[in-house]
């Protein structure tokens, strides 16, 4: 059987604080490592989705409603539901790694990078479905 979790694959988080949120696999670890013996992945997702905007809203209101809040997390495969979709966002692997998630200052830098990549993608209008809240 082929590998399902690949970088760029869109997944749904099933458990925890971010349950029901869409995320993208940044790096996968199929066999596990010494500190985490189970298969897991580093994911970057959207915690707070942008709100709906209409043409009769002002510039300030549109700017406020277009904000999104990202998250970075190491999650076990059992808590992820892979989809058939993928998003081709190229994250910098030197900034986004397990060491960066442990140190608060590095994590902040990584989150800023993720936010900029997602906002750039959102503003260009690519992958519109990824930036909408999952209705269930």
From Swiss-Prot:
Residues 5-36 form the KOW domain. SUPFAM superfamilies: Translation proteins SH3-like domain. It is found in: Cytoplasm, Cytosol; Cytoplasm; Rough endoplasmic reticulum. InterPro entries: KOW (IPR005824), Ribosomal_eL27 (IPR001141), Ribosomal_eL27_CS (IPR018262), Ribosomal_eL27_KOW (IPR041991), Ribosomal_eL27_sf (IPR038655), Translation_prot_SH3-like_sf (IPR008991). Gene3D superfamilies: 2.30.30.770. One of its GO terms (molecular function) is structural constituent of ribosome. GO terms for biological process: translation. GO terms for cellular component: cytoplasmic side of rough endoplasmic reticulum membrane; cytosolic large ribosomal subunit; large ribosomal subunit. Its main location: cytoplasm. Keywords: Cytoplasm, Endoplasmic reticulum, Ribonucleoprotein, Ribosomal protein. Pfam families: KOW (PF00467), Ribosomal_L27e (PF01777). Belongs to the eukaryotic ribosomal protein eL27 family. Component of the large ribosomal subunit. Component of the large ribosomal subunit. This is Large ribosomal subunit protein eL27. It comes from Caenorhabditis elegans. The gene is rpl-27.
């Amino acid at each position: 059987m082929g590998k399902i979790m690949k970088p760029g694959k869109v997944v749904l988080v099933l458990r925890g604080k971010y349950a029901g949120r869409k995320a993208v696999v940044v790096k996968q670890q199929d066999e596990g490592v010494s500190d985490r013996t189970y298969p897991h992945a580093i994911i970057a997702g959207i915690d707070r989705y942008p709100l709906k905007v209409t043409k009769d809203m002002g510039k300030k209101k549109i700017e406020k409603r277009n904000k999104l809040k990202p998250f970075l997390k190491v999650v076990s495969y059992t808590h992820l539901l892979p989809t058939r979709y993928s998003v081709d966002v190229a994250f910098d692997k030197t900034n986004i790694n397990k060491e960066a998630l442990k140190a608060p200052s590095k994590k902040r830098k990584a989150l800023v990078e993720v936010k900029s990549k997602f906002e750039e993608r959102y503003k260009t209008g690519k992958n519109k479905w990824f930036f909408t809240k999952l209705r269930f």
